[in-house]
Curated annotation (Swiss-Prot):
Belongs to the RGI1 family. It comes from Clavispora lusitaniae (strain ATCC 42720) (Yeast). It is found in: Cell membrane. Keywords: Cell membrane, Membrane. This is Respiratory growth induced protein 1.
Length: 197
C-alpha cells in the first residue's frame, strides 16, 4: 500500500514579512535573460526578455512567490498568474465547491461588489505586504465585455525608494496587475507583472 501525496501548503504570515529597506544591484543571473534584437536601422540592440510566467491555483502560494522573489532580489522581474476562487465565495459555500451557485459570476452585482472589495481591501494590500515595498496602483481601468470584466492597474511610481537609490542601482520598474472574472463561474484570474523599465 502506498501513501497518498499530502497537499503541500505554504506557510505565510503577513504580519512577519519584513519591509524591503534598500535596493541592491541587479542580480548577475539576469544577464541570461538579455537577448540581442536587430533594430530597424540594422544594428543589434540588447533587450531583456519578458519574465517567465509562474502559474498558481491558490492565493497563499501566489503571495509566497511574490515574497520569495523580493528576497531573491528579483522583485522587479517577475510574472505570476493566479486562478482561484476568491475567499468570499468559499466562505459563502462553506469551502464546498459543489455548492457554488450558477449566479456567482460577473453578472451578479453582489459578486462584482464583493470582488472589488476583495481586490482593493485584501488582494492589493496583501501583495504590498508580501513584496515589502510600496504599491500605488491607483484607480483601475475597467473593461467589460459580455463574457468578462477586466480591471487593469498600473504602478509606475518610485515604490517608496529615493530616486538617487533607484538610479545608483539602475532599478527602475513598473508593476501591472490585471484581475478578471467571467460570466460562467466565480473563478478569478489575477495576472501580476513586475517589469524593468
Amino acid at each position: 500500500m502506498t501513501k497518498g501525496k499530502k497537499k503541500q501548503t505554504v506557510e505565510l504570515d503577513l504580519n512577519k514579512v519584513e519591509k524591503l529597506e534598500h535596493l541592491m544591484p541587479v542580480p548577475k543571473s539576469r544577464q541570461s535573460s538579455i537577448t540581442s534584437v536587430e533594430s530597424e536601422d540594422g544594428s543589434l540592440k540588447e533587450v531583456l526578455k519578458p519574465p517567465p510566467r509562474k502559474d498558481f491555483e491558490d492565493l497563499a502560494s501566489f503571495e509566497s512567490y511574490i515574497r520569495d522573489e523580493t528576497w531573491d532580489n528579483e522583485f522587479d522581474y517577475c510574472h505570476a498568474h493566479l486562478t482561484y476562487y476568491p475567499p468570499f465565495v468559499l466562505k459563502e459555500v462553506h469551502d464546498d465547491i459543489e455548492k457554488i451557485k450558477p449566479t456567482m459570476n460577473k453578472n451578479s452585482s453582489k459578486f462584482r461588489r464583493n470582488l472589488q472589495h476583495h481586490i482593493q481591501r485584501h488582494l492589493i494590500l496583501e501583495m504590498e505586504k508580501c513584496c515589502g515595498f510600496e504599491m500605488d496602483f491607483g484607480k483601475a481601468k475597467m473593461e467589460e465585455t459580455p463574457k468578462n470584466i477586466i480591471w487593469r492597474y498600473e504602478d509606475s511610481g518610485d515604490h517608496g525608494f529615493p530616486k538617487e537609490e533607484e538610479d545608483k542601482f539602475n532599478r527602475h520598474w513598473k508593476l501591472e496587475l490585471e484581475v478578471s472574472c467571467n460570466n460562467e463561474n466565480p473563478l478569478v484570474q489575477v495576472d501580476y507583472k513586475a517589469i524593468p523599465v
